[in-house]
């Protein structure tokens, strides 16, 4: 939860606090600030997003040996014969260097493996200290596990150049979708809790709730105490959510359920009341953003995306 809030604080002054702000500016030409689009009922969301989600799930997200290189740099190992599982387990113990996630990728033929470190993340781009530590750790593992490093030596200046580029790419595609519930009178804490429970949310404590991904510990969206006079804020962290369009409709449905229980209106950051057409327009913008992710070799909610966007 802390990470979700930190991103807005780390953005430069004047920058959008999330994807939603950028979306709303697209509709500025309409008198009522509501995008002109045909309403797609929430019940049809599966049809609306299903075809693209299926295609996106087929994208290469770095699970194979020939994964994306835009956001990671790696060191490859080779051993004589089949690489023992104990050796792979030892390589997998390297999960983070500094603030950057590291993952182990098994190679073809069962005699190769790779340790890949993220070039950038929400904490910034890979720095020289992290790169030096990563290289030293790989050399130590190669010596202790009797492995041969077969990849070329990393050029620090080139890696830093790639890391800066990776950070720029991540900043360009990163985004959160958010809106608020405003009411004339604040309801009781128990009323809020009952409304959230009725909407299928789990309590996080201190007036915070979340929707959990079925069958996993992943969070679909969060509901937080509102700011700037709002009662509640609804927040979806797009890069970390599987099937973001479906997650968006799920968050909208939960918000409407809570609104029916507590009253009030659902508004954007500028306190503009959101219509069904606005919600559907945003869904299409989210779908466009997912395409950008896939083109970059990432899949929202996938292993690599969740490692990078933390």
Segments (PLM) and residue ranges:
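Charge-rich interaction surfaces and accessory domains that mediate macromolecular binding and assembly
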Residues: 1-171, 261-310
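Membrane-proximal, solvent-exposed terminal domains/tails of membrane-associated proteins
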Residues: 152, 163-178, 182-185, 195-310
């Amino acid at each position: 939860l802390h990470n979700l809030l930190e991103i807005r604080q780390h953005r430069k002054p004047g920058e959008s606090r999330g994807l939603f702000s950028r979306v709303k500016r697209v509709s500025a030409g309409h008198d009522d600030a509501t995008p002109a689009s045909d309403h797609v009922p929430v019940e049809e969301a599966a049809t609306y997003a299903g075809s693209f989600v299926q295609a996106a799930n087929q994208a290469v997200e770095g699970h194979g040996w020939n994964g994306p290189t835009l956001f990671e740099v790696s060191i490859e190992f080779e051993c004589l014969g089949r690489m023992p599982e104990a050796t792979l387990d030892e390589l997998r113990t390297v999960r983070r260097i500094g603030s950057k996630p590291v993952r182990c990728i098994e190679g073809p033929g069962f005699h190769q493996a790779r340790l890949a470190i993220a070039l950038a993340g929400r904490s910034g781009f890979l720095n020289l200290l992290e790169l030096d530590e990563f290289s030293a750790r790989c050399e130590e593992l190669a010596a202790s596990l009797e492995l041969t490093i077969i990849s070329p030596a990393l050029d620090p200046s080139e890696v830093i150049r790639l890391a800066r580029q990776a950070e720029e790419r991540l900043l360009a595609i990163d985004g959160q979708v958010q809106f608020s519930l405003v009411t004339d009178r604040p309801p009781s804490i128990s009323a809020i809790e009952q409304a959230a429970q009725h909407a299928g949310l789990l309590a996080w404590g201190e007036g915070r709730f979340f929707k959990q991904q079925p069958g996993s510990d992943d969070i679909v969206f969060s509901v937080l105490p509102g700011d700037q006079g709002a009662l509640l804020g609804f927040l979806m962290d797009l890069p970390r959510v599987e099937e973001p369009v479906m997650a968006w409709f799920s968050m909208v449905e939960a918000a409407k359920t809570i609104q029916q229980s507590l009253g009030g209106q659902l508004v954007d950051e500028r306190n503009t009341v959101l219509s069904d057409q606005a919600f559907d327009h945003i869904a299409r913008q989210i779908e466009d953003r997912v395409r950008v992710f896939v083109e970059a070799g990432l899949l929202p909610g996938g292993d690599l995306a969740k490692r990078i966007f933390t």
